[in-house]
Amino acid sequence: MNREGTFIIIIFFTMHLKFNLSKKIISWYDNNKRALPWRVPFHSPKKLYYRLLSEFMLQQTQVKTVIPYFLRFTNKISTLKKLSKTNEKQILKYWEGLGYYRRARHLLATSKIIIKEKNSILPKTLSEIKKLPGIGDYTGNALLGLVYNQPRIALDGNVKRIFSRLINKRENKINFEKFVTKNRNKLFNSKRNSDFVEAIMEFGSLVCKPKDPHCNICIFKKFCKFKKSNTKNKLTSPINFSKKSYSIFCYINNNKQIGLTNKNDLGFLKNCNLPIIKEKINKQKIKNWNFLCNYRNSISNKTLNIDLYYKFSRKIPKDLSWYSLYDKKEFIPTFTKKIFRRLENLY
């Protein structure tokens, strides 16, 4: 670690001892926490399932977006054991609209391992829990803290923002992982480690917000160097939005059907039902296809520029299967449904 990194850690370490971060933030949490459907009592039999499901759903998705999907999912599948016995097609249907469907597949695979190989018990170490599909450092630490009350911090954007503002240093100048690892016992001064995991994330979401933080009601305002700073420096690293351009080719027929395939490698929609998608092709080079429209589709931090083409055909390539534009029983990602709505205008 460089000298600057060491200096930052010393500053924060001194500050932590000065006002006991964990107890102070848990006290705030007790009075201000949101009533979220996955927040069940610590000894509830639903705890493992609800925490596992919510952590997967919350990956790259905001709380307010997740809530209705979580309620719908748990209404259909009430236990982890039932989840492990549900087929992938049905899981994807219940997940439909939430996006990033790889999460749903990982959740299903993880549930099978926990039920069949782990005797319905979640692994208790980070190294073991990370062997489960779809679980990395962040989700692993969150689950160990939430399920087992272990002294853990899930280092999401909310938590990093709080720490960086307390010392008024840019996030990329702080080695958060090393700091938490080396000073874990001093960071956690409460027996309520599970609540601390949620409290610090909740505080970052409701008070120490990315834009327009509520500094005047902040419980740390007496100690926060960001609050005392006249410059109010921008401490977080900007999100890099990637831009991609695609040409999408849709086989359709007179029965209001479209040819789709799940044999694709489109990252965020890998193995989902989609038309033929290719890296953008110059319009002048495309023959025997009708151009329908150009549009943009934003997914998380991606902006997709899409040229949409179609042709009426009785036959389709072997990799494709016919799907009705109006069938609501099949799992169809929102990305594809937006294509459906544009094609409906042709009938």
Q: Over which residues does each language-model region extend?
A:
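Generic detector of intrinsically disordered, low-complexity, polar/charged segments
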Residues: M1-N2, Y94-E96, K131-P133, A154, ...
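Catalytic cores of DNA base-excision repair glycosylases
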Residues: F13-S22, W28, N32-H214, F220-F223, ...
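Intrinsically disordered, low-complexity, charged terminal extensions of DNA damage-control enzymes
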Residues: R3-V40, S44, S205-Y347
